[in-house]
Amino acid sequence: MKVTFEELKGAFYRVLRSRNIAEDTADKCAEMFARTTESGVYSHGVNRFPRFIQQLDNGDIIPDAKPQRVTSLGAIEQWDAQRAIGNLTAKKMMDRAIELASDHGIGLVALRNANHWMRGGSYGWQAAEKGYIGICWTNSIAVMPPWGAKECRIGTNPLIVAIPSTPITMVDMSMSMFSYGMLEVNRLAGRELPVDGGFDDNGQLTKEPGVIEKNRRILPMGYWKGSGLSIVLDMIATLLSNGSSVAEVTQENSDEYGVSQIFIAIEVDKLIDGATRDAKLQRIMDFITTAERADDNVAIRLPGHEFTKLLDDNRRHGITIDDSVWAKIQAL
């Protein structure tokens, strides 16, 4: 089925207000969930909303909490999220990193005691739209086996890097081949994964999303490389925020909350003039996209460039929502 942006935002807002969330908070949170979905990231927008409400109902998320600054060291700040709403807090932290970068050239905010930020790419994009390089990542509960294991001991720990090119170039990737949200998207669509995404119960690589969702043997991207990157991202976020590691979140909490996150903004224009910046970025993009294609029918892709088209299509034709997901939201 298809819905308009306003219909989708209204559905989110209704559910949030039914939980006695303050009007302004409910409006901003509903807006962010709807924008994420409109951008084509269904896995962390509309599909994730029922899970968000479950955590809200369970008390994992404290909707009226106010993030507090703990430490300030010039370009680096440490904050405590107080388990406030994840996407609203993350937006505020990237805004703060941008403010610090305006003063110092670079700004870094380390956040502890946070909740799931939904679409991490929103915050990298937020920085790039203002002309900054945006880098952010989060740890998580243990949902992926480290390389060589079959028991979950590391997080998917998504990493975002956004560049202020035209259009914006952005990598938004979990340390697994696919996020659990994308496994769900493919399962609901009745599709196999395009490449192996995990192991089946016999330890064989599989493209079946439902199997991986059930046994939790998701595959690290790049095998041992994704496993290693997940571990060091967790270590950095834990140390800089003085927050919880994947181990602590997994062993001490009843669900995924109280995670640690990093937000970095770099003001490129303090280092290079705008015309030179744009020319250098365009040369990089042209060099890549003019390579001989392996398949004449498949374009060479630059990361994040597809979001401009997805957003335009959804605004023109309506946002496609899975019927079963929409039914869940209507029932909340």
From Swiss-Prot:
Homodimer. It catalyses: 3-dehydro-L-gulonate + NAD(+) = 2,3-dioxo-L-gulonate + NADH + H(+); 3-dehydro-L-gulonate + NADP(+) = 2,3-dioxo-L-gulonate + NADPH + H(+). Keywords: Cytoplasm, NAD, Oxidoreductase. Catalyzes the reduction of 2,3-diketo-L-gulonate in the presence of NADH, to form 3-keto-L-gulonate. It is an enzyme of class 1 (oxidoreductase). GO terms for cellular component: cytoplasm. It comes from the Bacteria. Its EC number is 1.1.1.130. The keyword NAD applies. NAD(+) binds at residues 168-174, 224-225, 304-306. It comes from Salmonella newport (strain SL254). GO terms for molecular function: 3-dehydro-L-gulonate 2-dehydrogenase activity; NAD+ binding. Belongs to the LDH2/MDH2 oxidoreductase family. DlgD subfamily. HAMAP family: Diketo_gul_reduc. It is found in: Cytoplasm. This is 2,3-diketo-L-gulonate reductase. The active site is at residue 44.
